[in-house]
């Protein structure tokens, strides 16, 4: 972890040096110190409200570190997506602290913070351009070889190779000619080429058939390797291999543990599991 004294820095920036992410801490004498970015994320008694009269999150505490997969489950409106929005600093919290590698995220430039976070959404954002260009959007200076390698790791290379012009096939608009699964594979490849230390997977496999989900899940597994990963999903297969599962209800974490521990408790998670995860 970065020494706690770093929180007093007025400016903390993330940068990439020779393929490694690092924090750059400026000092009063004009020098800087580089500290490798790890991806430790801590929520410390966090409260949050979109409006003053309605609190959304209550006393949220959690810790996630590289190599860990932390999943959030619960009914719609429980606060799952709100937590990931706070990691991105789309909103500032009302009380408590969020730390990233020991640094209060309020001390980190928003652009730098978000550059170190990869996101895979259910509604994949593709644009008019080639497949290569869409994947490269995750890292604009990526070489063709890096893009292709990312697609291979994401399990997208096979379907891309079957397209009329492969990686040079042009997608129109939102790439409606591709299946939902193919669109998600491109989104995974884009996140893979970005090679960020923290990954957020939001509803990433909830609208595809079971067969396609297996292909996407394989790409997801490669993407999550060695990273700090936060997952929000509808399907139990997406979360049951998580290191920690946070069961949320009305903005609170009411249960936490791994799949086996929560099943043994026979609480809310057990109800969701036996009910085919319909509420998650």
Place the predicted regions along the sequence by residue:
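ABC-type nucleotide-binding domain
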Residues: 4-280
